[in-house]
Curated annotation (Swiss-Prot):
The active site is at C61. Belongs to the glutamyl-tRNA reductase family. GO terms for molecular function: glutamyl-tRNA reductase activity; NADP binding. Catalyzes the NADPH-dependent reduction of glutamyl-tRNA(Glu) to glutamate 1-semialdehyde (GSA). The record marks H100 as: Important for activity. Substrate binds at T60, C61, H62, R63, S110, E115, T116, E117, Q121. It catalyses: (S)-4-amino-5-oxopentanoate + tRNA(Glu) + NADP(+) = L-glutamyl-tRNA(Glu) + NADPH + H(+). This is Glutamyl-tRNA reductase. GO terms for biological process: protoporphyrinogen IX biosynthetic process. Disulfide bonds: none annotated. During catalysis, the active site Cys acts as a nucleophile attacking the alpha-carbonyl group of tRNA-bound glutamate with the formation of a thioester intermediate between enzyme and glutamate, and the concomitant release of tRNA(Glu). The thioester intermediate is finally reduced by direct hydride transfer from NADPH, to form the product GSA. Its EC number is 1.2.1.70.
Length: 333
């Protein structure tokens, strides 16, 4: 249930989103923008316990976005500093911020058109913001309604079906490298992307699948190794890196052994990239930049009617938010 605060939105004070995505900005710049926005987010945090926080940071494989309530001057400063990094940011305010997030959650702004993973990624970003700060009502309203309508969009409308997915790319790459179905696969981390790839490959006939995680897992027909037991000298033909925190989870000496096994492939799904050492062989290391390039080449076109319908829903909720805030201000007079 959203809780209304005392905030207001006017010509100077906007509800907005600033960010970069796969469309305009390369992986290296997205990594830099993520670090910058993580620091910039601190300026949106409440200075006193009774104040409300005014930001949500969304970071995925293909986009980095900061949603917040601030003056135009603050957003302009952020945009300028991001451009100085060589990245190309976008900024949407008020009703356009609503329509943008609704399209993002609905999978209509994704590299993999109609993907479902983004719904969970947005929800986790929202829940993390709630844990860290008492969030302003307008941001509660924006994210709760976007998550609700994203789910409705998928259940009531037929999203475009596609085999142009990250798991499909992985299978394509394994076939190109002539990787046998008997190859041993190690998934570092039980992340959503690792799970989706593992179960996809299992259906394609790969049976020697191992997950490495902090805690014991309940896995059927798959093996597990705990973090303290993993060794890259073991004969894993393919290693999948599922999250950025892996970079700091193991000593550098362990990482340096990642290329010791001849012919090994490493897929790095993380942004920022998880591998802390230079690849010994570039054609054996595949990061999200290469994956994004392949997905972009095979990308399906957006369905205009579905995109427009999501935007219209976002606009209606923007108008609803303004009515709610106006009633709140009127009641306090």
């Amino acid at each position: 249930m959203v809780r209304e605060g005392e905030e207001h939105i006017d010509e100077e004070f906007s509800l907005g989103v600033i960010g970069v995505s796969y469309r305009e900005t390369a992986l290296q710049q997205r990594e830099q923008v993520l670090q910058f926005l993580q620091q910039a987010q601190l300026s949106f945090y409440p200075k006193f316990p009774q104040e409300e926080g005014r930001s949500v940071l969304l970071s995925t494989c293909h986009r980095v976005e900061l949603y917040g309530m601030a003056t135009e001057a603050i957003f302009s400063t952020l945009e300028k500093e991001i451009r100085e990094m060589g990245a190309i940011p976008y900024f949407y305010r008020n009703q356009d911020c609503f329509s943008h997030l609704f399209c993002v959650v609905g999978g209509m702004d994704s590299l993999v058109l109609g993907e479902t993973e983004i719904q969970g990624q947005v929800k986790r970003a929202y829940l993390q913001a709630i844990e860290e700060q008492k969030l302003a009502f307008a941001l509660h309203f924006l994210f709760q309604k976007a998550l609700k309508e994203g789910k409705v969009f998928r259940t009531k409308r037929s999203s475009p079906s596609t085999e142009i997915t990250i798991p499909a790319f992985v299978q394509h790459e394994l076939q190109k490298q002539k990787m046998a179905r008997s190859a041993s696969l190690l998934f570092m981390g039980y992340s959503e992307i690792n799970r989706s790839v593992a179960y996809y490959l299992q259906k394609q006939g790969f049976s020697r699948i191992t997950f490495c995680s902090r805690q014991p897992l309940s896995l059927r027909s798959m093996d597990q190794v705990l973090r303290e037991e993993v060794c890259f000298q073991d004969p894993y033909h393919v290693i999948f890196l599922g999250s950025s925190e892996l970079r700091h989870a193991f000593p550098r000496s362990l990482w340096e052994g990642v290329w010791d096994f001849p012919g090994r492939l490493v897929f790095d799904f993380a942004v920022p990239r998880a591998l802390p050492v230079q690849p010994a062989c570039r054609d054996r290391y595949i990061d999200m930049e290469q994956i994004s390039d392949w997905l972009r080449q095979h990308q399906k076109e957006v369905f205009p009617l579905q995109l427009d319908s999501l935007r219209e829903v976002g606009y209606r909720y923007w108008e609803s938010l303004n009515r709610r805030l106006a009633r709140r201000r009127y009641a306090s007079v």
